[in-house]
Amino acid sequence: MSSFIPLNALEDYSLSSAEEHTRELQIEEGLKIFQKALHAQRQGKLDEAFDLYDALFKIDVIHLDIDDNNLSPTVGRLKYLAYKNHGILLLEHLAHNLDDLTTTEIRDQLQDILVQFADALLVDDSDDSFLKLFSDLARIIGLKRLSRFALECIVSSPSRVFTFSESLLNHDFLNPEEVAILQEVVLLAKQLQDYVSMDSPMYDLMASQVADVAPAKKPKYISWIEPTQFKAPPLKDLKETWRGSELVVEIGVPSWRGICKGLHDSLHRLTKRKKVLNGVTIRDPYLQIGVEISSVHGKLVDEEDLEDPEDDVEMMDIIDKPAEETIEVKTEEALDSTVKVEEIPAEINIGEVENKSSTEENKKQESPENGDKKEASGNGNGSAGPPVKDTTVKTEDRDSLTVALAIKRPAEGTTSSSQPPSKRTRGRGADEPAELEKQVDPGFFNNITSFVGSLDLKFPFVDLNQLDNEEQFYQDFKAVISNWGEQGSELFLKLSSAPESNLSVPVTQILDSAAQVDDDYGAPCNVLSISPDKFLEQMSESCSLSDFRFKIIEALLGNSSLVNEIWPSELIASVQIILNHLEPQILRDVRQMFFDGQTHSDSLIKQQLYVAEARYELVANEIIADKQRITENTSKLTKSALRDREWHKKTLHQRLLAWESCVITLLSMCKTRQLSVTELELRHTWVRLSLSQCDEAEISRMRQNYEEFQVQLLDEAPDLMVRFVNFPHIQTLSLDSVNGQISKLKVASTFAKIFSPDADEDIGTRIAMLESILKGSSDTSGDRESLSAREFLQHASIDFKHKLWYLLLDAYNESGEKRISVDGYIEMLTSLSYELETAGYRNMNPNQRHTILLRTLSTMNDTVGNLAKICRDTPALLESVSREKIHELAQLCLSFLRLLQVFNQFYDRRNPEEPTPFLWDKASEKFQTMMVKLWTFFYLLFRQLTNGLDENLPQTTISTLNDILSIVHEDLGHRKCCSFANGIFVDLTLDEIVRMKWNESEADLLQNIRCRFGIQLANEHYHPTDHGATPRALKRSDGLAFQDFIMNMVYRKPSSVHNIRADLRAVMDQLYEAIGDPDKNIASTSHNMTVLGRFTVAPVTWNYIENSLRGESFLPFMTSTDPVLSASTGGFYCVQGMLALAKFRQGKKAAAPGRTEDLQAAVKFFTNDILCCPTRYESWFGIANAYEMLTEDDLMWSAEKLDVPNSIVNINQRKALLCGLNSVNLMLQQRDEKPANPQLRTFFNAVMKESQWLFLSKLFYSATANPLHGASFRQADNKIFCGMKGLYMRQNLSLPRRKQCYQVVRACLTISINSKDQPPDWYSYYLRSKVYSKLKKTTQAILGDIQKSIAVAPDKINGDILLEPHYKLVAYLYKAVKRGKLTAAEAYKELKKTPHFVEYLGEDADMESGDDSDSDSEVGSDSETESTKEGPIASATEPAADTAPPVVPSEGTSGSPISIDDATPVPGPVTAVTAIAAPPTVAAKPEEKKKPLTRMEIKFYKSCIETLRRMKVLDKRKWHHRPPFLIARIHKEVFEDYRSAKEEMVPFFNLKNQSKAPVHIWKPDFERAGKHFQYVFDYLMFFIVLLDKTDDTDAITTIGKKLRRFNNGMVNHFEVWEFTCLTSNVLMKRVTRIPEKLPDAIIPSLQFDNFDRIAQGLQDKITKSKEPASYLLSLLYYASEFRRLNNGFGSTGVVDDTVVCLYLKMLIEYAGTSLLADNKSRSSTPVVLDGAKFEFQPGSAQPPALPAPATTATTAGKKEDGKKEKTRVTRKDILLRATNLIKACSNKVGENIKLVTTKGPPAVASSNGSSSNSGTRSNSEEKEKEPTEEPEKSTQDSDVEMADANQGNTETTVEPEAEGEADKSAEEDKSDKSAEEEKTDKFAEEEKSASAEPAGKNTPKSKSTGSNGVITIDEEYSAPE
């Protein structure tokens, strides 16, 4: 392949990963196979290539739709190449085997090749040569249109630059191949006689282009094909070839159905093959082209002789074979060749299925639904049925009966979805007799009897094999069930007295069932009696195919068998197929018979009349069925289906008119010959009247027609009865039927009002009409319509009467008269039992008894169902019924249940492997539904008898009721039917369990919710079983009903939320989906939402804090009236919130970010609980936890939100404070009250391990300390008021001070520690020690809490070492010794109290204490002085000595409230970026000599270091970063060992270029949220100082580049960046020995031309040199990088000065004195650039002042053209050339720099003549630069620190790198200023810019000059706590 498309070119989002991976593998495999096939094809290995292509086409991906968006383009390309090359391979194979093939075979193979090519062209049609090949092949075999289409694709191909049309219009040159294509297109158009196209201008143009061109020659690649041999023979010759052929119809069963099926299969097999004579494909399955088979023979064969229909049968070519040979076409194997017949019971007459046996086709179209819909789809009843015997019969009677009994049974019905044998009895084998069955276990009967026996109710045991002593209907029921067939199922399912669910059906159709009298169910009916023997004898005679069909039709339809005898539905379908293809000939023959003068026999005419009438009736029946189907299912059909229906309806109507005309013609001929055809004429009129009802004609007109027909019937044939047994939609023709139709039409208007869908609007009128019809006592009472309806009802069926009664009772129920409705249903139910127990029933014949029994059971099913539903919804209705009546009804229910136990036993004994009748599944489901309804109604009666509705039921009654429900449910569930009847029994059981609240009913509840809702939940003792029930959706009422049981299971094990099982959590989620949230439209809920919303946005005032801590705060909530109050009272929402919190915590423990969705869900759940139960402090505590976790999550991953005023962090923390305070407030209010839900209180105390007081203390401490600094206590803005003097702004609330917040924390911690309910907690002591430190408590109190924390703390928590309290002890002791609060000896004694103490045993005080720990270890840092943080790095600022004078707090600031007005930074200790400007009039403070360390102090400090190292070793996960940081602090502050301190801090920092973050430390578990970013700030500031001390330019520049974009990883990013820039630039100047103010000394002496020449020379020298970058060049690159990164972010003055200095130093080293050689006219005093004169003295403030330039010197000259000539060099000129130098040397700098600083920079002569390479400055030099520190301020002074420190930032403007010449000239004109004045103005501007920095950075930028002119840097930080 020329190109390869990657498999992952398209991303498939809709496919699963597995499916996508499978496709990719298939594509890869297909490509490999195709390459192998192509290789074999090229080498001529055709067989191997065919095999490979076959394997290729078996891959699924080849056959996918190329338009699928999920399909890779590679598939389309592979598919195109595969089909194209496979077609070419077939063409090559045809060329090699051409001599061995016949003409037909060659044509067939060419067709197959074209099919392959067409499949390829469907994918890609852009290959012109391929289209030309396709066109040539198509034209050869005569497919001219296809050939033309291919050529037109070439002509109009869009892949060409210019189409043929454009080329012709432009008169462009066409090559010979293109001309040949045009010639063929024109030629084909002429051959096809497409004159329309030929007359078009384009064809004229093409014809003119090819007019003089010679015809194209035949392509060489197909020259071996002769097109003349593929010319198709004419139709006439084709017909002749078929004459003399013979068709053998093989029949497996000697019956009419077998004959018709054999004929159909033979012809179907004949036309199934594509390859027939001479390549002609016969598409008409019945050869309607006129070809006749002259001889048709019938042949009886055995089943085994019938060949597989899939065997290939080739037709023989008559050219190669003799014509006299026959053509044998064998049929498919008949599905019904072996007829399985049910045993026909002697009691049931065949007549029962009259008018029903041929309903199969109609049922398939209509699909009528049963009254009781199937509730359990997986109940396993699919193959349940009685045992049957298999016999093969040879008579038509049995064959016909089988079809009547097994209508449309699917062939696979006997093997699909079989149910395993019942657990009660084992399944019986197919050959095992029923007599060998095991006896039925009477346990179920005994259990029920033990409960109902005390009420004198009987439920004796009944056995299927011992029913002789029972009532007659028991024996009848056994006979019906034992010999159950389709006639019984159909009868039972059809007998339903329930009202029609679809009342939109025309009333005439509803009343049709009423016209059928009850005797129709039991009337005898014959089966097909026409014997096929005579026809089979004639099969040996030769006849044509049409004659063969006519003989079948005449034999079957030439009499009245179709209307009076039951036919198999398959036979009727076959006859209709034959008639569909014979009706043109029949109609033509009848018409010819009428018009020609030939004399036909009377028998032939009468026979034709019978056939025509039968066909007319078949079409009429189909039209009626179609009318009803369209009426019922219109809403369920698509527009396309409706159009098809309309077309079908139109076709049927045309066919009906044709046959009606035929029947009328034949009737007239018969009357002319005086033939007796009265019956046929009456049949025709009756069917026509039935059709008129479907046309919705006027009722009066229809009634008149029926009355006229009644007169005609009385006159001509009063005793005539035509059953129409095979026409389910045509009523029986008899005088009674006519009378019934007339009565129906008389009362149609009356019943239309009853059955109308609008009848419910006037329920009173409907009741009155039904009462008049049903309850009329005399014939004269009522109006005329009522009398007519009453008369009609006397002859109507019992089912119809019951239907009217149901309508009346339902109307009572809907109108509120439920009591009357119940009485009516009870009377109906009582009458049903009397009907079975009377002597009249026993005296009936078996057929009548069975019919009445099934009808009674069907009616009882509807009656009991309605009673159970009404009484369950309204239990009080049974109270008005007498106890005796209830007892009678209960016994009646038990009697019917005993009867249904006969069915159960038979059902349990079935063999699932045996076939079952078609409708057995639906019938068995109806029996089981009946049983469910009976048990439901019986329980309601039994409960009424036991007074089960009383409020205070004894335990024995509750136990009895619960046990009955449990036993019955187990029995019903065993048969997978407990959820039948819309789950009425399961719903009743659930209601009773919830109502009675029995302690031992939990198992029953679990089983019921499993069956009803599909909820799979188990307890410790019971696991519900699968009853095969189909669950329904859980509703709100259901969830509220049994949520108490679920909550009890939750409260059972309250040790942890994680102990709640996963299935229980899933159930709670389902319950929440059903219950939902409180309704916001309810007044109480809406009010509480408003109160809660206002409360959570209120500020946290000191007044509210005090009231809450005293329990005196109240919120105006209302008592909820929401229906979900019961769930909330049970703790449902509260527990859900706890689960959501636990889920979030679990995600955090997995070292992954928690899902905020869980926290939001927790807030929602707790809010719902507060809306319903606002006084539950557990929910307030939970929602406070959720808000605090949201705050922590926002501060976990980014510091961005710390600098945003009124951010979501502050909002969530404020809500957490408010809710936490209210939780404590409610707890204090309820401390003496008994909890409303003790289980929830116990669960809450067990789950929420943390005390509320401890949580509140942590919440206040986190909100008060850094980095938040009390932002959540501040308001977003101030209030604006209008007073007497105008508008003014102030805060009207008293906000808490920092000291007050710390006092709240101390009080909460003290309560938590002293609480007896909570065990001692190490964190409480730990946090209180920190608060004591903030509140300036005594050292003994602080140490006491730390030591208690160590004593209580465990060694490990969750597998990790606990180091916090131990580190706290070391850090505080170090701080106390440094501040002089403890002596070294005292601190050393206290240090021994930590178990991690390691004693230092060295004797030398000067011993090095460097640590050789692994540099790759991950460690952290600590700085715990939040309260003293005043400057930008105040948390890292501590006094340098204990003797520092204290600062007296100002009275004005002490105790001042936190206010936005106090946002101005308060003067604090000197920091690293603080500008130290010493007043010129005040002398500098003399340096204090540091006191040497004593041996005890050295031992103490060294022991601290060893102890901290011990902690580092114990920290296996390297998460704790504060011990290494404290070690580094001790090295720096005590021993002044900067390199050891640096080695301790190096593992924290990423000094490699691969990492983007400058520092990397982990957050320990007990570290406050957001504190992590403060530590990053402290460590960076500290490490920058260490790098400056050790002259590490490489590390400081690397960190500087990473620091610029690290603004979201720390606090005060701008200050760290400014400090880093300042320190790095000072360091670069120092290591290169650049004197101060070098530019001021050099730039005035530079001449521009000379400077420009030297700068260019320096650049050329460096760029041309092959040596690596020099040290100065590398530093210049780093300085320029700092300048670039700082551009637009901060002030660039210092960085610009460094770049200028470094570049000037490079020029000096390069040019020496020549740099100033041409500047003699500008200065009277020469400037010396070498030796010691170039260096400045250490003590000097500035370099020696240069002589003033000569007054006569000019700054600029003029060129010849008059323009000014630039002579002066500015800083911008130097910056521009330095930038150009860096760009020119880009290959040597950047990533290519190899900067080595271990040996330091090159030695530079100092002022005293010595040189130094040391990387670390001396201690004495550092002491001169260290400022004195201020002591720690008190908490009162720091109250103002809670003012907002995060305000807007004002960015400084940035100077451009270069300006235009005009700006430079204007700058040069300022010659009156000296260089010193310019420098002073520049620094003044920078100071102004620094003062404009935002207050959010806490201090202005730290740039000033000291007394000695050097920028000082403070390295001191506060000691960690």
From Swiss-Prot:
Residues 413-422, 1899-1910 have a biased composition (Polar residues). GO terms for cellular component: HIR complex; nucleus. Coiled coil: none annotated. It comes from the Eukaryota. InterPro entries: Hir3/CABIN1. GO terms for biological process: chromatin organization; chromosome segregation. This is Histone transcription regulator 3 homolog. It comes from Yarrowia lipolytica (strain CLIB 122 / E 150) (Yeast). The lineage of its organism: Eukaryota, Fungi, Dikarya, Ascomycota, Saccharomycotina. The gene is HIR3.
